[in-house]
Amino acid sequence: MTTLLIDNIGSLVTNDPTLDAGPLGVLRDAAVVVEDGRIAWYGATSAAPAADTRLDAAGRAVIPGFVDSHAHLVFAGDRSEEFAARMSGTPYQAGGIRTTVTATRDATDATLKSTVTRLAAEALRSGTTTLECKSGYGLTVEQELRSLQVAAEITDEVTFMGAHVVPPEYAETPDDYVELVCTAMLDACAPAAKWVDVFCERGAFDLDQSRAILQAGIARGLQPRVHANQLGPGPGVQLAVECNAASADHVTHVSDADIAALAGSNTVATLLPAAEFSTRAAYPDGRRLIDAGVTVALSPDCNPGSSFTTNMPFCIAVAVREMHLTPDEAVWAATAGGARALRRDDVGHLAVGARADLALLDAPSHIHLAYRPGVPLVAAVLRNGEIVWQTKEVTS
């Protein structure tokens, strides 16, 4: 057993509400001891026990690694021209997904693996240590299974999303596609996934179709999540609560009844601020959700069409500026909130026995993540207690 002491931490975010140190449980002049990839101790630097090795944080802020609970990384092709068209006034429509479906079906395994690996590494450099990844750009039995197998190379949090949109070959017979998803596709894909997701939205899947798909996934041992209420008011949030989904994602257009349902449930509302940023859509009112008692997570929603970024610090800044979260709330949502959205208790916070996933910031406080938007503040990232990325300055 080897131990690592990280000391001289200027500001340590623990997300431990029992410390009587604000909602983030912030400790000053702190230290952390890691043993065999897990948190073994944390507290004041002056009380830190000895360890085999030492990392001097040099006054930096240290936070739990970000937990990204919503990502679409298995794809091929480029939709930058679609983005440019939106910036020229063309409204966003979910149908653009079909463009990526064609490119993904035509791509080699090597191409898909290269893209996923590159984007996961990009997310890691911005502090993300836990990452969910969905299928959804194959939309045949064979292609969806391939996408899940590619996703499994970078994460255990693999989501089957054959119900992303109805593929072109089923445009006239969408119920036949739903039947395929509920039977042969899930039979083949469920063993390769942990979660089942559905885009419950106009232009995608209606309430009855979405419910049937989620129930078919649940019957095969998958846990549900829902893309809900992104493009307009709809039944997605209520369906998510009905199915005890881990999360309802987007939640841009929600009613008082939707918010009350979320607040009284175990379903997390995952906000995806980069999607609104990239589509010029109205932002959901995060303040309204939090004040009502809804548990909120943040995610970049990395995908090639409506939000092509993996950068959680950017999302924190946008959530503070446009969704009216405080910096503390946004950092909590990007760490502990994401863990709640994945129903994980071993990441997103510091506790003895939790996974030692940490990000060191070139800043004295986590507030700088919102205060200095666009600045690459992540100086080092630890996953399972090992430094997996760092700038030269951290150890020089």
From Swiss-Prot:
4-imidazolone-5-propanoate binds at R79, Y137, H164, Q230, S306. N-formimidoyl-L-glutamate binds at Y137, N303, G305. Belongs to the metallo-dependent hydrolases superfamily. HutI family. Keywords: Cytoplasm, Histidine metabolism, Hydrolase, Iron, Metal-binding, Zinc. GO terms for molecular function: imidazolonepropionase activity; iron ion binding; zinc ion binding. Its cofactor is Zn(2+); Fe(3+). Its main location: cytoplasm. HAMAP family: HutI. GO terms for cellular component: cytoplasm. Pathway: Amino-acid degradation; L-histidine degradation into L-glutamate; N-formimidoyl-L-glutamate from L-histidine: step 3/3. It is found in: Cytoplasm. Binds 1 zinc or iron ion per subunit. Catalyzes the hydrolytic cleavage of the carbon-nitrogen bond in imidazolone-5-propanoate to yield N-formimidoyl-L-glutamate. It is the third step in the universal histidine degradation pathway. The keyword Cytoplasm applies. Fe(3+) binds at H70, H72, H227, D301. It catalyses: 4-imidazolone-5-propanoate + H2O = N-formimidoyl-L-glutamate. Coiled coil: none annotated. Its EC number is 3.5.2.7. SUPFAM superfamilies: Composite domain of metallo-dependent hydrolases, Metallo-dependent hydrolases. It is an enzyme of class 3 (hydrolase). Zn(2+) binds at H70, H72, H227, D301. GO terms for biological process: L-histidine catabolic process to glutamate and formamide; L-histidine catabolic process to glutamate and formate. This is Imidazolonepropionase.
